[in-house]
Structure formats: C-alpha cells, structure tokens
Amino acid sequence: MSIEMLRKSNPLIHCMTNVVVTNFTANGLLAVGASPVMAYAKEEVADMAKVANALLLNIGTLSAESIDNMIIAGKAANKAGAPVVLDPVGAGATVFRTESCKRILKEVDVTIVRGNGGEIAALSDQAGTVKGVDGSIDSDPVELAKHAANVLNSAVVVTGEVDVVTDGTGTVCGYNGHPWLTKVVGTGCLSGAIVAAFASLKTDDFLEVIGYGLVAYGVAAEKAYEETKAKGYGSFQTAFLNQLGRLTDEDVKQHGRFERS
C-alpha cells in the first residue's frame, strides 16, 4: 500500500534539481502525494535539508557553486537521518560532471544513486555511452547496477527499458513504462524525485518500496499513453501528470510487473 502510505505521510522532498525540470518535478511530486520544496542558496540549504524527509541532488545544470551547496545540504541531511538521492545527470559526458558526482559521493553519505545505464557506468568505471544527458549500455543492467552498488557503496537505481533497484546483493526489477517518456523533457529527473519520495517512507523493505515506486511511475505512463496515443507527446505529458494523481495501489496491483531476486 505504498501509494496510500505516501499520500498519508505527504513527505517534504527537498529538490536541488536543474532549471530545465523544476516545474515538472514539483508538479509530479504533488500529483503522487509528496510535498516539494526547491531551495538552493548556501544560506538556507542546510536548514531546509534538516527538516525535509528526503533530499534530491540533481546535477543537470551544475556549477561549482551548486555542487558546493549540494554537499552542504547532503551533510545536513546525513546528520538528520534523511535519505539522499543523487541523480548524476550527464555523468560521463564531461570531466566536470563526472568528477562533481564523485566528489559528492566522497563527501556525502548518498543513500541511492539513480541514473541511466551510461551515467551509472561512468561513475563505476564500467563500459557505457553518454550523449549529452542520455546514456546507454551494452551489458546486463542488473549486473551493471549490482557492480555499481558495491563500487559506490550505496543503493543504485538504473532506469531504462527495465528499471533495476539493488543494494549490491538483492535486486528488484520493474518492467512497466513507455517509450514516450523519453519524448518529454524531465521524466527521467522526475523519476529521481519519485525515488526520493518513496525512499522517505519508513519500511522494513527498502528495495521493494523503491521498486514499487518505479513500477507505479511506469503504470502511470502506460495509462497516459493509452489515453493520448492518437494525440501526441504534449497531451501525453499532461495525461501523465493526471495519471500520477489518479494512481492507486489497486492500479499497481493489477498492472504492475516486477520481480525480485
């Protein structure tokens, strides 16, 4: 009953995300039942991170100053016991992006790293391809994710055709979603925020609750596509937010496809 649990708890998610996706991320979190706050200034990030239920660090439009501020917020979240999710957007595309992510991982106790296959491969010194903020791999995403979790010393989420959640030992794979998600800017970044929201829930099964959140996200995308396939990507974007808001645990039970190993 994770969606119902999320909506009842209405967790505050501190999003230090990129300027391209801020509005979409906030609306997506509101739709699913979380409460977003976007705070970036050095003077307040620690205070905000202390009261938030989870912290998202998304480096999409990074600068040296923004990385410094993310580290301040991350350390504050660590002290408060709140989960920290790193979304290493474009890691592997430039040295600055890759090294900035590695610095965050060194200085902050990151709970989950969520990225596409190319980004995760770049951070864990595995083979992959990154083009701008898009990435791909030739290897098995499960093995990639498990290796990365052990190298990075954090849980890892690799999103793509199959969504993989692992702590390096146990694994949950989700099989929901739709290719049209790749035609709307910000859906990958929103999935990182969704991961942060579900990570904030107090549960005995951390991997399963994160996997559940990603499957729910994919179910919403599938339902949005069925509603708008004769219209196009713009209509899909709106329908997707609507479906996130309407989504129930019964929907996930009926349409969700995932397995654990």
Swiss-Prot record:
Required cofactor(s): Mg(2+)
Domain of life per record: Bacteria
InterPro entries found in the cross-reference section: Hyethyz_kinase (IPR000417), Ribokinase-like (IPR029056)
EC number: 2.7.1.50
Top EC class for this record: transferase
Catalytic reactions of this protein: 5-(2-hydroxyethyl)-4-methylthiazole + ATP = 4-methyl-5-(2-phosphooxyethyl)-thiazole + ADP + H(+)
Pathway: Cofactor biosynthesis; thiamine diphosphate biosynthesis; 4-methyl-5-(2-phosphoethyl)-thiazole from 5-(2-hydroxyethyl)-4-methylthiazole: step 1/1
Pfam family, one: HK
BP GO terms, sorted: thiamine biosynthetic process; thiamine diphosphate biosynthetic process
Family of this protein: Belongs to the Thz kinase family.
Protein role: Catalyzes the phosphorylation of the hydroxyl group of 4-methyl-5-beta-hydroxyethylthiazole (THZ).
Protein name stated in the entry: Hydroxyethylthiazole kinase
